[in-house]
């Protein structure tokens, strides 16, 4: 028997064909969300309050500090928040201290700063009752970047940019005359030496001594018109603030505020880390020949002689000295922006490949402390030095698409940035209030206005591009949405501007971002998914795990290191399927490995690391595709994306052929209920599970608290599918931490179950499976194999209007008693009623405008003091094409103290209608390999082809769909699935390490099937065998969310657009089918004049004619001639508005007055033309 049996969860065993043992458990797949939010609550918020404290007034007398904060208890729990359309949030209370320096008085107070949305255990937020996910954003990391570019003459040029987290950009570039320029904050360019002089290196010789002599520097000094620091400062001021009178003091404060003021310029910890890494000497001296010795500045000891070539070993030896103080110099600069001394490290090296033996100076920034979040003069000098070194061939340019230069902003950081915006707006208000209010009676509460803070948080959760309505179609869709990485959003790219390079797969994505799972269409490559083992480090860079190789023994150790993309560039990594002996040594002398972007073969002694698992390359969704290695990447992409669109079925079934990921994905998705502690199950019912904790103390186990786990029953998901949880544990079971207690939607026995295992034959049948169409047996309809449950929510609110309040009632004018049969005495439909489109769900009336009373009404009014009630029917009705059974009704009343109702609403009624949808012709189906199709025919069971034992098959697929698509995985799945069914087992074939040919064929033989996996099929209609043997097997097929019931649409009459009077378009507007210009050409070509005329008039915008036609049809009369279409009038008016005099003439050249035509038609046809001027954008017809 190939493979070994592995237990997945409590209830499922699978025969696993993997050959590589799992050395590392998969991490918690939604950790990227929860970890980031925890960081925000523990550190991010405090960091914000520290950054903004203290807020001082303009005189410096008052000072406001934010000391500490705490989160209170949420007003509503999670369930209640969803039911009430409220936000699941906790009150944020901040301890604020106000110091009055004149008197030394200190006032402390706790200030409420709004409700702060809380993250649920499953990584989502509940905002206004709806579950939302904050998607992580991929952005360019703050750092120093060097770029190579070719100018129009074909010469190599460089440019450099210092990009902060927030603040002014600093850019260097060269021109055709070899002069180096600097741009401050994207303004006009200045010679680079002007900025150096402004920093305090005032004369030419100082600059040459600092940066080393070079042709580029000489050219720049020639171009530079300034001679000392003061002139340079004035020159910069004139460039940045043209038109303002320059003074040295103003220039200093301007330069200070642009680069050295921590409130305005922020590299962030990640920017400091990247800048230190880039500008430090250790990476820049690699393989360079020294032109002067390296000296330990403290002891005076020479650690590397002149002429030494610094290879990796030598660099590692002197690293400690390099990192502390080798060749350091300190400059005391006067008359400049910053008074502090500037420390740098400078080492002369020989220019590579230079026959004259010229030298150049390499300057490092002496590693400022990680707390220094501003740029320092040392950084600017070191970056200039790097630029000149590049011109001499020392150093590297950066690849902007490398994941070492792109980082993730997860929930915590996105929230922090938004909170910072709110706090800085609040800071302005506080300053203003400090100067107005009386110092004696002032309190912190009076100074603080929390509105801007609340508004910025609300805005972020409610309308940011990165705050998305959770995709809740099935557990995999939830999981993938939480692990999504987007390059779009504020501060990111836009679809239109994103080049091919940004979207492309990059070698640094390996193990960090899935190369397969990304949307098709305009967002391809901009929205990605995190790989299965990847995690995010403190700086926001994605890391992937590798097994460490012991360099002495050349064996794989148990140590696992997580490496970022730029760390990995220094190492050689062997593949996960390299052959090892039992001691972890490589069996082959030559090993397939990766180094930077190259896949190559190297000697086993050169290996530094080895992959953890073959599936570390791909995301969770892609890892659910068995035989992924046999599919073409385009189809694998479709397979990964379509799994997310599978509709949860009524009867779920896990795949016979899985990958072993199904259990992990189901557990971490948040759709299942998992145990928070180890314990014993005490009570199980459909609505809740009770578990008694088992606590271990001093080696003995005793019972602890009782935990309640409520289950969701038949709730509506975000996508309108049924969200239902079922217990899978029994009383007395001992459950471990994080074990699944209850299945969610699309789950079976703790595994993801998106579709059903059905018997599939690859064959044609009367041409019904042309173009990927699917032919299906009626058994799948009868036995509810692909039946799904859908829940739709409808709501109606009674508001206060100018003419009086709306009323929910059963007493509706002009409605038959039959139409009210499903309503209770309140006028609301009862639970369990069966409703179809057009039926009333909630009876509601709205007061009409007051009309002039007749004499009789005035008399009645005088006698009874009340006129007849003037109301119009505004009831909530079932929309077209909908209907089903009323599942639940929720009523919210203002009188009963429901403060969650929005202003002006007195009552809110929500009605939930459930539909059971069987599978239909027109529904979309797919497998897991991107093999999708639409059902074209449902064939009676007795007519389906049947196997030699008499069993009819379930589905027929077109064999032509396989060769050109190159997704051979589906054929292997088909054979292995049949074998698994016959053997009564489930199998797991993990990606890139699954069942190979021999495994598949040996399992087929074990199951007693034919060696070629094919069989004779008999035609169900005639009983004759088909000519050739046919591949028949079991395939896992999914029903997708694109259902024909949602797409079918028909209209007789309906709403028209106000200006053109043409029917609206689209199902949502109950619109018509557009008859466009090409269709008109077709009718013209046929000469179908009358058909064309009625399409352009009655059926479109002949306002008079269409009313008349409807009338004629109802009365059974002949249809009269059409009148002028409205669009002709619109055209005339357009031309008149351009000042052109347009007249309509008859055959005798007499002018026709359009108004007369209207009136004539109207009087002749008894049509009221006044109804046209209804001031709404979309006007319903009254016909």
From Swiss-Prot:
It is an enzyme of class 2 (transferase). It comes from the Bacteria. GO terms for molecular function: DNA binding; DNA-directed RNA polymerase activity; ribonucleoside binding. GO terms for biological process: DNA-templated transcription. It catalyses: RNA(n) + a ribonucleoside 5'-triphosphate = RNA(n+1) + diphosphate. It holds the Pfam family RNA_pol_Rpb2_1. Keywords: DNA-directed RNA polymerase, Nucleotidyltransferase, Transcription, Transferase. The RNAP catalytic core consists of 2 alpha, 1 beta, 1 beta' and 1 omega subunit. When a sigma factor is associated with the core the holoenzyme is formed, which can initiate transcription. Belongs to the RNA polymerase beta chain family. This is DNA-directed RNA polymerase subunit beta. The gene is rpoB.
């Amino acid at each position: 028997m190939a493979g070994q049996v592995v237990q997945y969860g409590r209830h499922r065993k699978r025969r696993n064909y993997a050959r590589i043992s799992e050395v590392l458990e998969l991490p918690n797949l939604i950790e990227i969300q929860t970890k980031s939010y925890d960081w925000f609550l523990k550190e991010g918020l405090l960091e914000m309050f520290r950054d903004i404290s203290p807020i001082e007034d303009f005189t410096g007398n008052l000072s406001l500090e934010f000391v500490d904060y705490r989160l209170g208890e949420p007003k509503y729990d999670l369930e209640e928040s969803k039911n009430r359309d409220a936000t699941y949030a906790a009150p944020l209370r901040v301890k604020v201290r106000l110091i009055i320096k004149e008197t030394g008085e200190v006032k402390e107070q706790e200030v409420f700063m709004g409700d702060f949305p809380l993250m649920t255990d499953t990584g989502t937020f509940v905002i206004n009752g709806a579950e939302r996910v904050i998607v992580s954003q991929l952005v360019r990391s703050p750092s120093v970047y060097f770029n190579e570019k070719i100018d129009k003459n074909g010469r190599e040029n460089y440019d450099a940019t210092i990009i902060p987290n927030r603040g002014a950009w600093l850019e260097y570039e060269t021109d055709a005359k070899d002069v180096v320029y600097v741009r401050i904050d994207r303004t006009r360019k200045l010679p680079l030496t002007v900025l150096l002089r402004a920093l305090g290196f005032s004369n030419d010789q100082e600059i040459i001594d600092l940066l080393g002599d070079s042709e580029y520097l000489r050219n720049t000094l020639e171009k530079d018109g300034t001679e000392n620091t003061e002139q340079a400062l004035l020159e910069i001021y004139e460039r940045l603030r043209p038109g303002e009178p320059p003074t040295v003091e103003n220039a200093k404060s301007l330069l200070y505020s642009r680069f050295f003021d921590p409130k305005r310029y922020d590299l962030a910890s990640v920017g400091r880390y990247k800048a230190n890494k880039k500008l430090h000497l250790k990476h820049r001296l690699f393989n360079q020949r020294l032109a002067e010795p390296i000296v330990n500045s403290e002891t005076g000891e020479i650690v590397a002689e002149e002429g030494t070539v610094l290879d990796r070993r030598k660099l590692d030896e002197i690293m400690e000295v390099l990192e502390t103080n080798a060749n350091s110099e300190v400059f005391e600069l006067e008359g400049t922006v910053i008074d502090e001394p500037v420390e740098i490290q400078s080492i002369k090296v020989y220019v590579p490949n230079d026959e004259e033996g010229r030298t150049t100076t390499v300057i490092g920034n002496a590693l400022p402390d990680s707390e220094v979040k501003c740029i320092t003069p040392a950084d600017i000098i070191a970056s200039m030095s790097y630029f000149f070194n590049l011109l001499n061939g020392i150093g590297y340019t950066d690849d902007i698409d490398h994941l070492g230069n792109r980082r993730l902003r997860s929930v915590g950081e996105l929230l922090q940035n938004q909170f910072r915006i709110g706090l800085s707006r609040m800071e302005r208000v506080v300053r203003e209030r400090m100067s107005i209010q009386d110092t004696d009676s002032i309190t912190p509460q009076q100074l603080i206005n929390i509105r801007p803070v609340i508004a910025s948080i609300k805005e972020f959760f409610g309308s940011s591009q990165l705050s998305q309505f959770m995709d809740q179609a099935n557990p995999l869709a939830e999981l993938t949405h939480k692990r999504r990485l987007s390059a779009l959003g504020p501060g990111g790219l836009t679809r239109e501007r994103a080049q091919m390079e940004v979207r492309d797969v990059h070698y640094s994505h390996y193990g960090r971002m899935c190369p397969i799972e990304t949307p098709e269409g305009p967002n391809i490559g901009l929205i990605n998914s995190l790989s299965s083992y990847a995690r995010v480090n403190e700086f926001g860079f994605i890391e992937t795990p590798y097994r460490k190789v012991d360099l002495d023994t050349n064996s794989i150790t148990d140590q696992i290191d997580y490496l970022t993309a730029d760390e990995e560039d220094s190492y050689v990594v062997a593949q996960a399927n390299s052959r090892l002996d039992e001691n972890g040594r490589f069996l082959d002398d030559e090993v397939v490995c990766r180094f930077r972007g190259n896949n190559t073969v190297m000697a086993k002694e050169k290996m530094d690391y080895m992959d953890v698992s073959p599936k570390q390359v791909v995301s969770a969704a892609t890892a659910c595709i068995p035989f992924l290695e046999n599919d073409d990447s385009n189809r694998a992409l479709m397979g990964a994306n379509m799994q997310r669109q599978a509709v949860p079925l009524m009867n779920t079934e896990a795949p016979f052929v899985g990958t072993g990921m199904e259990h992990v994905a189901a557990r971490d998705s948040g759709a299942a209920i998992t145990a928070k502690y180890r314990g014993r199950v005490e009570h199980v019912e459909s609505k809740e599970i009770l578990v008694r904790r088992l606590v271990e103390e001093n080696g003995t186990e005793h019972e602890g608290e009782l935990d309640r786990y409520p289950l969701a029953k038949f709730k509506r998901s975000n996508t309108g599918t049924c969200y239902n949880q079922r217990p899978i544990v029994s009383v007395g079971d001992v459950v471990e931490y994080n074990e699944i207690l209850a299945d969610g939607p699309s789950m079976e026995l703790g595994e993801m179950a998106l579709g059903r295992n059905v018997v599939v034959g690859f064959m044609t049948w009367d041409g019904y499976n042309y173009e990927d169409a699917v032919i299906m047996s009626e058994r799948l309809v009868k036995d509810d194999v692909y039946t799904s449950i859908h829940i739709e929510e409808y709501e109606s609110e009674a508001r206060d209007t100018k003419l009086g309040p709306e009323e929910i009632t059963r007493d509706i004018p002009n409605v038959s008693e039959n139409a009210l049969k499903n309503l209770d005495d309140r006028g609301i439909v009862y639970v369990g009623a069966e409703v179809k489109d057009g039926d009333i769900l909630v009876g509601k009336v709205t007061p009409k405008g007051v009309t002039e009373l007749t004499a009789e009404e005035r008399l009645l009014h005088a006698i009874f003091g009340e006129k007849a009630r003037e109301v119009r029917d505004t009831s909530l009705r079932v929309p077209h094409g909908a209907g089903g059974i009323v599942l639940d009704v929720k009523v919210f009343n203002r009188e009963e103290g429901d403060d969650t109702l929005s202003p002006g609403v007195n009552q809110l009624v929500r009605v939930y209608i459930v539909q059971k949808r069987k599978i239909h012709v027109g529904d979309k189906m797919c497998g897991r390999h991107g093999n999708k199709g639409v059902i074209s025919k449902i064939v009676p069971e007795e007519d389906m082809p049947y196997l030699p034992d008499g069993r009819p098959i379930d589905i027929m697929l077109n064999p032509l769909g396989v060769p050109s698509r190159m997704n051979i995985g589906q054929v292997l799945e088909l054979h292995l699935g049949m074998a698994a069914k016959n053997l009564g087992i489930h199998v797991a074939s993990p990606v890139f390490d699954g069942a190979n040919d021999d495994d598949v064929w040996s399992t087929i033989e074990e199951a007693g099937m034919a060696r070629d996996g094919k069989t004779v099929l008999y035609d169900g209609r005639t009983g004759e065998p088909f000519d050739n043997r046919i591949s028949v097997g079991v395939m896992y097929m999914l029903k997708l969310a694109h259902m024909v019931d949602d797409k079918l649409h028909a209209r007789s009459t309906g709403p028209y657009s106000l200006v053109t009077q043409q029917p609206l378009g689209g199902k949502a507007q109950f619109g018509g089918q557009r008859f466009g210009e090409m269709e008109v050409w077709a009718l013209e070509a046929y000469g179908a004049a009358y058909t064309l005329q009625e399409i352009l008039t009655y059926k479109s915008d002949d306002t008079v004619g269409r009313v008349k036609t409807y009338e004629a049809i109802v009365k059974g009369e002949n249809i009269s001639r059409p009148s002028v279409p409205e669009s002709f009038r619109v055209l005339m008016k357009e031309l008149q508005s351009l000042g052109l005099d347009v007249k309509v003439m008859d055959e005798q050249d007499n002018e026709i007055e359009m108004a007369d035509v209207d009136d004539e038609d109207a009087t002749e046809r008894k049509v009221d033309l006044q109804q046209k001027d209804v001031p709404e954008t979309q006007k319903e017809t009254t016909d």
